[in-house]
Amino acid sequence: MNTWKRYIGGIALILGLAVLPHCGFGETSAVPEVRGIVLTGEAKQDYIKTQMDALYAPPEDKEPVPFTAPEGWGYEKISIGNVPVERLAPPKPSSNQVVLQLHGGAYMSGLTDLYRTFAVRQAEYTNAREIYCVEYRHAPIHRYPAALEDAATVYQGLLARRTKPSDIIIYGDSAGGNLAVELAIYLRDEGLPQPAALILLSPWADFAHKDGTSRTENFTKDKVLGKGTPFAPHLRSIPPYAGGLPLDDPRLSPIHADLSGLPPMLIQTGSYDLLLTEDEVLAAKAAADGTPVTLSIYPEMPHVFPLVLPELAESFAAFEEVREFVNQYMTP
């Protein structure tokens, strides 16, 4: 049976891939119907490689097609405190929940259609009435703390719009996962109310490259960040967003930060993820600091797999886990 490891409050459990946990230990929800493409072994890795080659291929020389939201959805480009934001809203929301999306891209790239499409799924599985995608400033022009300032501005703007903090979910992947944790730390230190939950997909938790970790052990396995990808030549470089800060500064690398007093975290990663080790360290640090945390490791899956491989069964399972996590921690 495929398994992944989960940490809840520092307690590790091994669960089957088809079984999603309920909110109590020793209980499980019914085995859900398997959805998505099911692949194993070499067939799965070959498929992932093919999909990533297509994703990273140079764009065709033709006029890009503007993003179109699904039928019935609201979609608008707005500004909150001078920060560009894109707002998506499903046609028939059944809750007051709001998602603040912090996109990935190594703090080097802006919002793309990949993330707009991802936002639709994020809204669906979190039962959100609206989702705000933040177009924060990024390197190399803008360095720390530009992205954090923009994320904090939008969060406080949502509060000013009378959005309850208990209705807010911060959802970040990769660099956006880093930003989500750093935003929560900033809110705590400034005495501002915390969101209800943090959902972190393959968060970038350590700016320093360390040999002998998944950064090297998964280099040939991770088809999203590893060998043969556009990111591979830069993995040992100093991230431009760091500016003049040491790479182990807790403002850059949350594995070195005080993680007490933060909202419940769901950390999802893959056993082939280049950032697996630091995600494990982040989960252990959060648990040690008293923050409720769940770490799920999906077998043989790469970095940010639900974002770039949404059609696979593991991605459907990851989104179902998000749904259950949100149901557990959001106030009815």
Where are these regions (language model features)?
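Bacterial N-terminal signal peptides
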Residues: 11-19
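N-terminal Sec-pathway targeting helices
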Residues: 1-11
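Bacterial Sec-dependent signal peptides at the C-terminal "C-region" and cleavage site
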Residues: 19-29
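Alpha/beta-hydrolase superfamily serine-hydrolase fold, recognizing
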Residues: 30-51, 55, 59-332
